[in-house]
Amino acid sequence: MFPVKVKVEKSELEMAKARNQLDAVLQCLLEKSHMDRERLDEEPGKTSLDTHNKDCSITATGKRPSARFPHQRRKKRREMDEGLAEGGPQRSNTYVIKLFDRSVDLAQFSENTPLYPICRAWMRNSPTVRERERSPSSPLPPLPEDEEGSEVTNSKSRDVYKLPPPTAPGPPGDACRSRIPSPLQPETQGTPDDEPSEPEPSPSTLIYRNMQRWKRIRQRWKEASHRNQLRYSESMKILREMYERQ
């Protein structure tokens, strides 16, 4: 009789426990519907996702919620409303994504935001911290037309935003000639018909003649490059003075 009595007591305890869990679930559903209706009446634009998560966590324990639970939820909702009011309307909308164990709130950026601020916020890994909007850098002040000529003379005492243009290479269409020298004409030695022709030169003689010609061509290229650099002498002077000021 003793084992049978223990089995009966165990079944009664399980039945009482199941009834308590059922009562807790029903009571929680009633309070949830009441709070959802109250929230919809007060704040029609907000959802009750947080309330649902809290209710589910309570029902999972199988205990009856306390009598002060609605009061705590109202207090929590009041604190959230105050936080939203202090943070401004921009904190109400969030779109947080998680990528490689780091999170970023994309709702704070617009379609024209560069990629670098988004990467910087992702590296910070703080979705609740908003990226401060930086004012665009001021453009360079326009240079008046009457000051372009005096820019070279006053380069020591003022900032330089524009270098003077190079001098004209010469007549129109000679810009290419200032960089490329004129070709060197080959040396031809004509022989009269009545004189016998010279024998063919040896390879060493040909190499010597070609080396002399190559040297003259290289010297002509050096002279053309030097003449072209002289066109930028004013700009080089300004850059040299800026370097010496440092």
From Swiss-Prot:
Residues spanning the signal sequence: none
Keyword Calcium part of the UniProt annotation: no
Record's compositionally biased regions (Basic and acidic residues): 36-55
Pfam families: LIN37
GO cellular component, one term: Myb complex
GO terms (BP aspect): G0 to G1 transition; gene expression; negative regulation of transcription by RNA polymerase II
Cross-link Glycyl lysine isopeptide (Lys-Gly) (interchain with G-Cter in SUMO2) placement: 5, 7
PTM sites of type Phosphothreonine: 167
Ranges of Pro residues composition bias in the record: 163-172
Keywords: Acetylation, Isopeptide bond, Phosphoprotein, Ubl conjugation
Transmembrane parts of this sequence: none
Coiled coil ranges: none
Location of N-acetylmethionine modifications: 1
GO molecular function, one term: protein-containing complex binding
Region described as Disordered: spans on this chain: 36-90, 127-209
Modification Phosphoserine occurs at: 135, 138, 182, 202
Keyword Ubl conjugation: yes
Subunit (UniProt): Component of the DREAM complex (also named LINC complex) at least composed of E2F4, E2F5, LIN9, LIN37, LIN52, LIN54, MYBL1, MYBL2, RBL1, RBL2, RBBP4, TFDP1 and TFDP2. The complex exists in quiescent cells where it represses cell cycle-dependent genes. It dissociates in S phase when LIN9, LIN37, LIN52 and LIN54 form a subcomplex that binds to MYBL2.
Protein name in the entry: Protein lin-37 homolog
Species whose genome carries this gene: Bos taurus (Bovine)
Gene behind this protein: LIN37
